[in-house]
Amino acid sequence: MDRTAKADLVSTLNGVFNESAVVVVAHYKGLTVADMQKLRAQMKQAGATVKVAKNSLAGIALDGTDVASIKPLLKGPTLLAYSGDPVAAAKVAVDFAKANDKLVILGGAMGKTALNPDGVKALASLPSLDELRAKIVGLVQAPATKIAQVVNAPASKLARVFGAYAKKDEAA
C-alpha cells in the first residue's frame, strides 16, 4: 500500500469514527473467509459495517475523535464494527460471537464512553432505534384507538358503561 492509499484510508476511517454512534473492536483470529463474509452480510443487513484495517493506520485515524479510547485495544488481528445506530453493530457482533467462539469482543466505544466487553454485551441487549420508535408510535396511537373504539361503540355498550359509572358512584 503506497503512501497516498494509506492517507486515503486514514482519512476515510477518521470520517467513519467521527460519524459512527458506536464502534466495536474484536479479534477475528481463526475466522474463515466464509465466516467473515457471513459476519459482513449480517452487519450490512443491520445497517452496520465491518472493517479490517492495519492497527497503526486505525490508531492514527482515531486521533482527535470521540472514540479514541479504543486505541489500546488495537493489538493483534482486530476488526472494527461500526454503525450509526448505537445498538446495531454491538448486537450483531455479540450474536455472531455467541455462535462462533473465534470472534472475541475486546470492547468498544459509544461516543466518548469506552466500553469493556461486558459493556458491549449490555449495549447489545438494548432495543434498537427502530424498535424504540415502533414502541413510541404504538404508545401514541393507543389512546387514539381507544377513543375511536368508544365513539364507534353501539349505543347499548355506551349505556352499560354509563350505568356502571353511576352504580360505582352510588356505592361510593
Swiss-Prot record:
Forms part of the ribosomal stalk, playing a central role in the interaction of the ribosome with GTP-bound translation factors. GO terms for cellular component: large ribosomal subunit. It comes from the Bacteria. This is Large ribosomal subunit protein uL10. Keywords: Ribonucleoprotein, Ribosomal protein, RNA-binding, rRNA-binding. Part of the ribosomal stalk of the 50S ribosomal subunit. The N-terminus interacts with L11 and the large rRNA to form the base of the stalk. The C-terminus forms an elongated spine to which L12 dimers bind in a sequential fashion forming a multimeric L10(L12)X complex. GO terms for biological process: translation. CDD domains: Ribosomal_L10. InterPro entries: Ribosomal_uL10, Ribosomal_uL10-like_sf, Ribosomal_uL10_bac, Ribosomal_uL10_bac_type, Ribosomal_uL10_CS_bac. NCBIfam families: PRK00099.1-1 (NF000955). One of its GO terms (molecular function) is structural constituent of ribosome. The gene is rplJ. Belongs to the universal ribosomal protein uL10 family.
